[in-house]
A protein has these predicted regions:
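Conserved donor-nucleotide/metal-binding helix-loop-beta segment in metal-dependent transferases, i.e.
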Residues: 113-141
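Catalytic-core segments of class I nucleotidyltransferases/pyrophosphorylases
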Residues: 119, 123, 153-245
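Ligand/cofactor pocket segment of small-molecule handling proteins
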Residues: 137, 145-153
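Short alpha-helical oligomerization interface
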Residues: 19-24
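Conserved hydrophobic/aromatic beta-strand scaffold that supports enzyme active sites
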Residues: 131-133, 144-146, 173-175, 219
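Conserved N-terminal catalytic core of the sugar/cofactor nucleotidyltransferase
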Residues: 2-5, 13, 27, 31-106, ...
């Protein structure tokens, strides 16, 4: 199984820091932010990893990561020429992934607990998608998963709703079969003109082809100054950046 890290975007919410570097290279704990999703994939046994990023800072990311020998993995790099949404960036992984199932992590997502058990469950899943949820105090900032009465199935995902139907949010770790690329080709751009990953996930929801897990450990994205500080506190509190099981 292969892994994809999406590390594009211009990081407007972290300006002016992102005027000089890609946000995924900012320090979180004792390492650059992108090291955490890399370690997550490796902890799940995934060592063939594609990194998708924008053209402005591609050179910095390649210089930092190299071919992957420092991590005992293999890196491939692709450029997203312009911001077109998470699903647009994901579409660039089609040739890399081929006909296999794969795992996607957003490069600003920081977790303290290994995703290995969830990836192992996905390996046994015959088809479809698997997404990870976390219960949070302010779900309206994220994509919110509405669950059925028995909490067995996701019935809808709403992006940043004013009145969330639950406090379970979809974190930036997604597992897909190769059908996802056909789905991306057929989704309609959002009002901001981007291909949204929520539209992709809702296709799987509507077709009863998605399972979910509620993650253990702590999680945050690091895309704002507040959440970047939270991510640093989170990793320094465990006194290391090694993903644990």
């Amino acid at each position: 199984m292969k892994g994809v890290i999406l590390a594009g975007g211009i990081g407007t919410r972290l300006y002016p820091l992102t005027k000089v570097t890609n946000k995924h290279l900012l320090p979180v704990g004792k390492e650059p932010m992108i090291f955490n999703p890399i370690r997550q994939l490796i902890s799940a046994g995934i060592v063939d990893i594609l990194v998708v990023t924008g053209k402005d800072h591609m050179g910095e990311i390649v210089r930092l990561l190299g071919g992957g020998s420092d991590f005992k993995c293999r890196f491939t790099f692709k450029v997203q020429e312009k911001a077109g949404g998470i699903a647009d960036a994901l579409s660039l992984a089609e040739d890399f992934v081929g006909t296999d199932k794969f795992v996607v992590i957003l490069g600003d997502n920081i977790l303290t607990h290994s995703i290995r058990e969830y990836v192992d469950a996905f390996k046994l899943q015959p088809r479809g998608a698997r997404i990870l949820l976390k219960r949070v105090g302010a779900p309206e900032r994220f994509g919110v998963a509405a669950l059925d009465e028995k909490n067995k199935m996701i019935i809808q995902i709403e992006e940043k709703p004013e009145n969330p139907k639950s406090d379970y949010v979809v974190i930036g770790v997604y597992m897909y079969d190769p059908m996802v690329f056909e789905i991306i080709c057929n989704i309609i751009p959002s009002d901001r003109g981007e291909l949204e990953i929520t539209s992709v996930n809702n296709w799987y929801v509507k077709n009863n082809m998605v399972l979910y897990d509620i993650i253990e450990g702590e999680w945050t994205d690091a895309g704002t100054f507040e959440s970047l500080m939270q991510a640093n506190q989170m990793l320094f509190s465990i006194d290391n950046n090694i993903v644990g099981g």
